[in-house]
Amino acid sequence: MKKNSFVKRLFLLLSAFCLCLVFAAPVSAATIIDEWGKVVTPAAPQLKEVKLPAEGTALLLLDFNKQVCNDKSRPRCVSSIPAVSRLLGEARKANILVVYSLTAGSAAPDIAPALAPRPGDPIVTSGPDKFLGTELEKILKDRNIKTVIVTGTAAHGAVICTASGAALRGIKVVIPVDGISAESLYPEQYTVWHLLNAPRVATMTTVTKTDMIQIGTK
């Protein structure tokens, strides 16, 4: 009897111990992959009118070369060219600095004709971050640039990297949403959201449209 009683008590103790381990075990937190379908799309940001002085402002045209901006691989880039061309015209009238970038393996003649650079316009060639391994930072510093209008493709490549790089260097960033593009809508949406919410970048970024930008105002 005593032996059976001891075994019974031991069994109960072991059972209680096991239950404690079960309840004490940390619960694995759900990851973004687990909850992917629960993500709610943020409300669209409000676009703002932007008035910029000619002095201290530059227009960046990123990777409008035919290798990446074409009807087959990125038709949304081609569709953005008329709006960017109009903005470029305003930039030329205001005589502000216009800087171009190219992807590796391309050259100035590959840029969309409507956006063709003029002699003397700076052109840099690099990967997505146009500051990395180029003279872009020096070009902007030499002209005392305080604000850059960033246009180009891809939104989730050259635009987000270069705009963030400018903001983190203390340069204000203006993003005309009709002047950036990607293969589909989501990367463009994500890029806008990121630039308006990322630490240190958000406070330096304004989102607008090309026809809401005035250049040459005090």
Where is each model-derived feature located?
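Bacterial N-terminal signal peptides
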Residues: L12-V22
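A cross-domain feature marking catalytic cores of carbohydrate-active enzymes
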Residues: F64, Y100-T103, V177
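Active-site-adjacent betaalpha module
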Residues: A29-A58, R86, G105-K218
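Sec/Tat signal peptide C-region and signal peptidase I cleavage site
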Residues: F23-A29
